[in-house]
């Protein structure tokens, strides 16, 4: 009995591989564009959640009649937001001099009611991200983020300008958002 074989010939297989290759080349740029758009949407979502956390902490401070504590001879704003105590900005010091800050925006965690930060540190920025968001992405310093692929955002403080810059680490993008402590503003930069 003669058994007929069925299947692809070598020529048909080569043609299929070439066609699939051409389709892949045509689809790859679209796939990369979709991936970049997803990264942009991701950082915009995180920055939006962060800004909401900032405003929610400030609203809690207003709702609690602007609580403050005295440290030394100075009065500092503070609030318990979602079970965490925060130091907040103040527009005037105890003598009435302007501080160039707007009232009521989170600066750092208040762990002891005794030591308001004199400058902004990377750790303050990390603490803010981890405690203002309900489900924060993994965040660490720039040096730690470069060596750990599980870190999704690097945090860097600019103590002179009182800003926290958070850079998205996924795919080595340069997308970032900046929290301006003086004004409470959160600005996203997509690159």
Specify the residue positions occupied by each region the protein language model found.
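Membrane-proximal N-terminal amphipathic helix
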Residues: 38-67
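Intrinsically disordered, low-complexity regions enriched in Pro/Ser/Thr/Gly and acidic residues
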Residues: 75-191
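C-terminal or internal capping secondary-structure element at the end of a domain, subdomain, or sheet
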Residues: 13, 20, 26, 53-58, ...
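Secretome/extracellular-domain signature
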Residues: 66-77
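Alpha-helical interaction segments
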Residues: 20-21, 40-41, 51, 76-77, ...
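N-terminal single-pass transmembrane signal-anchor helix
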Residues: 2-42
């Amino acid at each position: 009995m003669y058994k007929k074989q069925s299947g692809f010939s070598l020529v048909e297989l080569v043609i299929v591989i070439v066609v699939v290759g051409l389709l892949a080349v045509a689809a790859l740029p679209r796939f990369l564009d979709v991936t970049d758009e997803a990264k942009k949407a991701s950082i915009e979502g995180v920055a939006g959640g962060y800004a909401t956390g900032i405003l929610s902490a400030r609203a809690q401070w207003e709702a609690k009649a602007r609580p403050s504590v005295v440290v030394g001879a100075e009065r500092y704003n503070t609030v318990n937001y979602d079970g965490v105590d925060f130091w907040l900005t103040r527009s005037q010091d105890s003598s009435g001099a302007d501080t160039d800050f707007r009232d009521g925006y989170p600066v750092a965690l208040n762990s002891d009611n005794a030591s308001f930060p004199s400058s902004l540190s990377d750790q303050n920025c990390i603490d803010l991200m981890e405690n203002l968001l309900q489900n924060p992405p993994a965040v660490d310093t720039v040096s730690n983020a470069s060596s750990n692929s599980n870190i999704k955002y690097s945090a860097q403080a600019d103590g002179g300008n009182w800003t926290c810059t958070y850079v998205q680490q996924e795919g080595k993008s340069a997308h970032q958002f900046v929290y301006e402590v003086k004004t409470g503003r959160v600005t996203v930069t997509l690159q």
